[in-house]
């Protein structure tokens, strides 16, 4: 058989072909999502109408708020999940406890795991979900649009002068992100340089002194303007740099909406004057 790659196809035709190749014998009919991010992925992939239950804080889109909750920070309600008879469970590998998931898998329930550490993996998850969706073309189109948006941001901000960026999560204790997280990738996408990218653990706890020695030029947090005020006050008087607050749900969820946070960050980073080169 001639490899498909030898004959370039129009984009729309390629998406349709992928949809046909990945269409399962029977799409999922009863889906349960165990995290807010996988709930958003389900809707983006055309599985929203098939959701029968979700996790706490699954609040986007609006229709997700009407669904029953079977998971929270306290754990997973295995008994209730079994009563709902799902034929697909969407799980967050980094956030859901593994033991109840193993129990559910042992009973023959298919489990789709999502835990992207690279921004392009969100598009890959959408492509993979197409095999379970009654509308696989919607999943592939969402993945393609996501990739296009990422590439647009990369092209637009690739030549930006890097700004040393501190990703701040909390104050007491003070946590940040290594270079192996989605949040760090968003910073890089916008021309930022994560000052703790070299950390060996994904979410290191750091001291005030360690942050100061790395001389950040901008601080990025998730939250509202009040968070900006609190963080600015926390660092005074030793550190006076711009603080950018990003929509918490956009920035912290591994879903297509993370690109809204990226756009928000890129625009604000670009408006910050590049500091005069420091003498060494």
From Swiss-Prot:
Swiss-Prot/TrEMBL site (Important for BtuC binding) positions: 79, 209
Matching Pfam families: Peripla_BP_2
Domain Fe/B12 periplasmic-binding: 30-277
S-S bridge residues: 190-266
Localization per record: Periplasm
Presence of keyword Signal: yes
Listed GO CC annotations: periplasmic space
Binding residue positions for cyanocob(III)alamin: 57
Keywords of this entry: Disulfide bond, Periplasm, Signal, Transport
Annotated signal peptide: 1-27
One GO MF term: cobalamin binding
InterPro entries per record: ABC_transptr_periplasmic_BD, ABC_transptr_vit_B12-bd, Vit_B12_bind_prot, Vitamin_B12-ABC_binding
GO biological process: cobalamin transport
Annotated function: Part of the ABC transporter complex BtuCDF involved in vitamin B12 import. Binds vitamin B12 and delivers it to the periplasmic surface of BtuC.
Quaternary state and interactors: The complex is composed of two ATP-binding proteins (BtuD), two transmembrane proteins (BtuC) and a solute-binding protein (BtuF).
Family the UniProt entry places it in: Belongs to the BtuF family.
Protein name: Vitamin B12-binding protein
Species whose genome carries this gene: Yersinia pseudotuberculosis serotype O:3 (strain YPIII)
Gene for this chain: btuF
């Amino acid at each position: 058989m001639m490899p498909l790659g030898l004959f370039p196809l129009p984009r729309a035709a390629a998406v349709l072909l992928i949809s046909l190749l990945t269409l399962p014998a029977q799409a999922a009919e009863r889906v349960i999502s165990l995290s807010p991010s996988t709930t958003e992925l389900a809707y983006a992939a055309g599985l929203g109408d098939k959701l029968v239950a979700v996790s706490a804080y699954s609040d986007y889109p609006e229709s997700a708020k009407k669904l029953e909750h079977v998971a929270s920070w306290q754990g997973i309600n295995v008994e209730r999940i079994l009563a709902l008879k799902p034929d697909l469970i969407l799980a967050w590998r980094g956030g859901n406890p593994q033991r109840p998931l193993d129990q559910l898998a042992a009973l023959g329930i298919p489990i789709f795991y999502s835990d992207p550490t690279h921004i392009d993996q969100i598009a890959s998850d959408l492509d993979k979900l197409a095999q379970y969706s009654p509308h696989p073309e919607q999943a592939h189109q969402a993945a393609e649009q996501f990739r296009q948006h990422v590439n647009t941001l990369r092209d637009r901000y690739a030549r930006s002068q890097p700004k040393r960026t501190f990703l701040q999560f909390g104050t007491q204790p003070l946590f940040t992100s290594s270079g192996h997280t989605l949040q760090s990738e968003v910073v890089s996408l916008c021309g930022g340089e994560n000052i703790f990218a070299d950390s060996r653990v994904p979410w290191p706890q750091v001291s005030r002194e360690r942050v100061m020695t790395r001389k950040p030029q901008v601080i990025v947090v998730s939250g509202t303007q009040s968070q900006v005020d609190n963080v600015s006050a926390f660092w005074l008087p030793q550190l006076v740099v711009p603080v950018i607050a990003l929509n918490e749900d956009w920035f912290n969820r591994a879903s297509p909406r993370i690109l809204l946070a990226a756009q928000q960050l890129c625009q604000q980073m670009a408006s910050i004057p590049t500091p005069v080169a420091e003498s060494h």
